[in-house]
């Protein structure tokens, strides 16, 4: 039997979700905001690596906990995927066990404790924003660096194996219909729903006519965005408007 605490929710975030300035944290932040607006009491757990603590999150949540991401060679040599094993704080588990509220794991990155026996009586929800092993496979194919190629292929293999832990979730919330279909096919014992990305735009604000340039916006430290930017640069001379 799954025990829940009504109107309270633990959210485990892969990063500090404010400011909401890139894709993953935009979804997390505006989800927190939407839930808080509906009167849900949120206990937020953030893995921290480069982004500072934020008063904005304290204002929205009942409590906010921050944990260091355990990066380095030891985490990279684990049988678990690096993006997951480096997010394994025992303090997180201790805080999750302080009550019986449901737990929302934001992305496979945060699912180190998803299958932990101490959480077996808890309602566990996973927000799936990618099919991670596919994503890392494409990153491996896209890079020219031999070291990065080996790392991405290894991480893809480990993610494919670790993904089987999703069978311990009660719900998977996919961000696209394609991912919903994938997870529903591979994990028939789990309830899979499609809930599109949360964001701050409440209505379309487009102006009549057309603009004077194409704008590319992306975090260039992410290889996928870097490769896209390079392709667009090659296409730029053929475009009818300037590319910014």
Predicted feature residues:
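N-terminal subdomain of nucleotide-sugar transferases
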Residues: 1-63, 98-100, 236
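Conserved catalytic-core segment of nucleotide-activated headgroup transferases in glycan assembly
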Residues: 27, 194-244
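A short, charged, and often flexible helix/loop element on the N-terminal side
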Residues: 64-92, 144-152
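Membrane-proximal helix-turn-helix segments that form the acceptor-binding/catalytic region
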Residues: 93-94, 132, 144-172
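Short N-terminal targeting/anchoring amphipathic segment
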Residues: 94-112, 123-125
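Active-site proximal beta-strand in glycosyltransferases
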Residues: 102-103, 119-140
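A short beta-strand/loop micro-motif in the catalytic core of glycosyltransferases
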Residues: 103-104, 152, 168-176, 242
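Helix-loop-beta element that forms the nucleotide-linked donor phosphate-binding surface
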Residues: 118-121, 164-199
């Amino acid at each position: 039997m799954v025990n829940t605490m009504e109107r309270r929710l633990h959210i485990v975030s892969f990063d500090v979700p404010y400011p909401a300035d890139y894709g993953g944290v935009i979804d997390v932040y505006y989800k927190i905001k939407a839930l808080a607006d509906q009167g849900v009491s949120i206990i937020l757990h953030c893995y921290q690596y480069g982004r500072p603590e934020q008063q904005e999150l304290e204002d929205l949540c009942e409590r906010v906990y921050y944990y260091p991401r355990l990066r380095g060679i030891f985490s990279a040599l684990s049988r678990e995927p690096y993006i997951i094993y480096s997010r394994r704080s025992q303090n997180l588990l201790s805080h999750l066990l302080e009550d019986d509220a449901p737990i929302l794991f934001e992305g496979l990155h945060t699912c180190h404790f998803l299958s932990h026996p101490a959480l077996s009586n808890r309602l566990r929800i996973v927000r799936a924003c990618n099919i991670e092993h596919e994503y890392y496979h494409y990153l491996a194919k896209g890079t020219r660096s031999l070291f990065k190629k080996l790392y991405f292929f290894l991480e893809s293999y480990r993610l494919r194996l670790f993904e089987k832990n999703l069978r311990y979730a009660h719900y998977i919330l996919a961000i696209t219909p394609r991912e919903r279909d994938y997870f529903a096919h591979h994990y028939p014992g789990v309830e899979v729903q499609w809930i599109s990305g949360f964001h701050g735009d409440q209505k379309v604000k487009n102006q009549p006519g057309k603009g004077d340039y194409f704008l590319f916006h992306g975090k260039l430290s992410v290889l996928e965005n870097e490769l896209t930017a390079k392709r667009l640069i090659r296409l730029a001379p053929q475009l009818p408007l300037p590319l910014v």
